[in-house]
Regions:
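Non-catalytic terminal/interface segments that mediate subunit docking, oligomerization
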Residues: 21-26, 32, 44-50, 55-60, ...
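Catalytic alpha/beta core domains of metabolic enzymes, predominantly
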Residues: 216-353
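A mid-to-C-terminal "edge-of-domain" accessory segment
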Residues: 2-41, 296-478, 514-517
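Short, small-residue-enriched loops and turns at beta-alpha junctions
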Residues: 42, 46-47, 76-80, 134-136, ...
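Short beta-alpha connecting loops at secondary-structure transitions
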Residues: 137, 212-214, 242, 270-278, ...
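N-terminal capping/small domains of soluble enzymes
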Residues: 1-109, 373, 378-381, 385, ...
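Alpha/beta enzyme core
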Residues: 4-6, 11, 35, 51-70, ...
Length: 561
């Protein structure tokens, strides 16, 4: 079977919500929602090998460290393993006083009772009950009328009320989900939720959580936002309800739907770290939280050590975090493209020069350092990279700040190596290539400095006297000029017949303090009009310039050969 030329014969577009005066498009997110992690329930039921108790406890500890205050810890009626874990956690003393655990149950008497039993001994807990309300479920799965489906919800609400009353030592809270809300009629969802509220009698001080799930994402995020706003505007006693969102990612817009849902009036978000969950996954709590953070809103969740968080999540779920996953992926802060690298490099340079803390670096919506990432991986070099890439790598790794024209010269060496190897070049590759290209090592060097002296003559000129190796043999040399650079150039001309003219000179410190070294760069012209570059590095800035001249001399000899 192949894709249809006319998919309209098989699929129908989702009907829009009649909400001509919608308000959510004009709103912004200015404060964080209540966060509920369902990693230990929805996330766990969606992995090939569900977590054992060791992994669940490790994941729970991680969520506590991040700052999640509401954690769904399981589906106790699913089996003895789930029940035992929940009971064990409740009695372990590991649940901080400011964290409320939650369990999920279907709207059946025996399952609800079992759920309350699993939470006996808890300081505070949320019991979350659900039943599906959409036409497909009513007509195909249950074969029930609207009223029959509503009575399931009402009966479940009465059980929540009565079971909680039997256990007054726990601070009980309730959550109701009209499952499949996003594909159900809004008037019916409102009718069912109002009936549940009539039973549980929530107040503004103790609201009922009404969770409105996109159980299967069926429309664009704006439609979901319309549904949420319509529901919020038409729910009686709205202040006694905390509107919660549980989006899925079937159409790839679970995060967007959750964000627009917040703008539409929701108070709470359910999801998983890095979007784990059934099918294409749940809303990613990391993405939503850090989206807020990059808009200047404190999400109340701490992802300062994101690599450690990823390590734990991957271990517990047995699933890798995609390298392109927003904020957490291995490659999300990495640029290979030359133009991107150049923009990022300039952005960092400008950031250092400004006196304000405002983050403005092209291609990086967040400072990687805020998440515990280093800058070394921001720019990586391959055959697609430009000058900005390797220049950044050298500066970050070695403190080398290449002049623009030297970047262009070195680019030929980097490009040639990248083409030869056919892979990404790491920092060691680039540093090794740089040292070889500018004769910072003995390999391939005709001239190498051993030692020297500079003296001042009575006429004001400078005399350079030194020992250099030429072809591996020591040779005493000397020359006179107006300064150190010119005296070394005179030495090369008089002793070896090398005519080199300095066109430009740059120097800077490598590091700070008394242990700082110096780097010197010389652009030089040869008699035939070609140019060569010399690079010198030494503890002493004067010696660095001498080494740079000999580096240029080595390049000149190589050109002649």
């Amino acid at each position: 079977m192949t894709m249809l030329q006319d998919p309209g014969r098989k699929y129908r577009p989702f009907p829009p919500v009649n909400l001509s005066d919608r308000q959510w498009p004009n709103r912004t997110i200015t404060h964080p929602p209540r966060w509920l992690s369902t990693d230990l329930r929805d996330g766990n039921q969606a992995i090939v090998d569900p977590m054992d108790a060791v992994k669940k406890n490790r994941f729970f500890d991680l969520l506590v460290q991040i700052g999640v205050k509401e954690i769904e810890i399981g589906f106790p009626a699913a089996g003895q393993t789930e029940f035992d874990f929940i009971q064990g956690l409740v009695h372990s003393g590991k649940i901080p006083d400011d964290i409320t655990v939650q369990v999920l149950t279907q709207a059946r008497k025996d399952l609800i009772q079992r759920s309350f039993e699993s939470l006996e001994g808890a300081r505070a807990a949320i019991v979350h009950v659900y039943n599906a309300v959409s036409p497909a479920w009513r007509e195909i799965v249950f074969r029930m009328t609207r009223d029959e489906v509503k009575q399931i919800a009402v009966g479940a609400a009465k059980l929540l009320r009565d079971e909680a009353a039997k256990r007054p030592d726990t601070d009980w809270h309730f959550e109701y989900s009209p499952e499949t809300f996003s594909t159900a009629e809004l008037d019916f969802s409102l009718d069912v939720c109002e009936a549940v509220m009539d039973v549980l009698r929530p107040t503004k001080e103790r609201p009922l959580i009404l969770n409105l799930p996109a159980t299967v994402e069926a429309a664009t995020p704006n439609v979901y936002a319309d549904q949420i706003e319509y529901f919020c505007r038409n729910l009686p006693n709205r202040e006694a309800a905390a509107i919660s969102l549980h989006t899925h990612n079937d159409r790839g817009t679970g995060v967007a739907a959750a964000e627009l849902g917040l703008m539409a009036g929701a108070d709470r978000i359910e999801g998983c770290l890095f979007g784990n969950g059934e099918r294409t996954g749940n809303c990613c709590l990391v993405t939503v939280a850090l989206n807020m953070y990059t808009q200047g809103v404190d999400p109340g969740l701490d992802f300062s050590e994101i690599d450690r968080i990823i390590e734990t999540v991957e271990y517990c779920n047995g699933l890798p975090v995609h390298p392109r996953h927003p904020y957490g992926g291995e490659l999300v802060f990495t640029a290979f493209s030359g133009s991107h690298q150049d923009a990022i490099k300039k952005g960092f340079e400008a950031q250092e020069m400004r006196n304000d803390e405002l983050w403005r670096v092209p291609y990086l919506p967040i400072d990687p350092a805020d998440l515990g990432r280093t800058y070394e991986a921001v720019i990586r070099v391959n055959s697609q990279s430009g000058k900005g890439g390797f220049a950044w790598v050298l500066e970050q790794g070695q403190g080398i700040k290449l002049p623009k024209k030297l970047q262009a010269d070195f680019a030929h060496h980097v490009q040639r190596l990248a083409d030869e190897l056919g892979r990404e070049l790491d920092a060691d590759d680039i540093w090794r290539t740089f040292r070889k290209a500018y004769y910072l090592d003995r390999d391939g060097a005709t001239f190498e400095l051993v030692d020297y002296e500079e003296t001042r003559a009575s006429d004001g000129t400078r005399l350079f006297t030194g020992t250099i190796t030429v072809g591996g043999k020591h040779q005493q040399v000397s020359g006179r000029g107006k300064g150190l650079v010119s005296s070394v150039l005179a030495t090369l001309q008089q002793t070896f017949g090398l005519e080199i003219e300095v066109l430009d000179y740059f120097e800077h410190a490598l590091g700070k303090g008394t242990d700082a070294r110096a780097a010197a760069y010389l652009e030089c012209s040869l008699p035939d009009g070609s140019t060569v570059w010399g690079v010198g590095i030494d503890e002493d800035v004067a010696t660095a310039s001498v080494r740079a001249i000999l580096s240029a001399a080595n390049a000149a000899v190589a050109v002649e050969v």
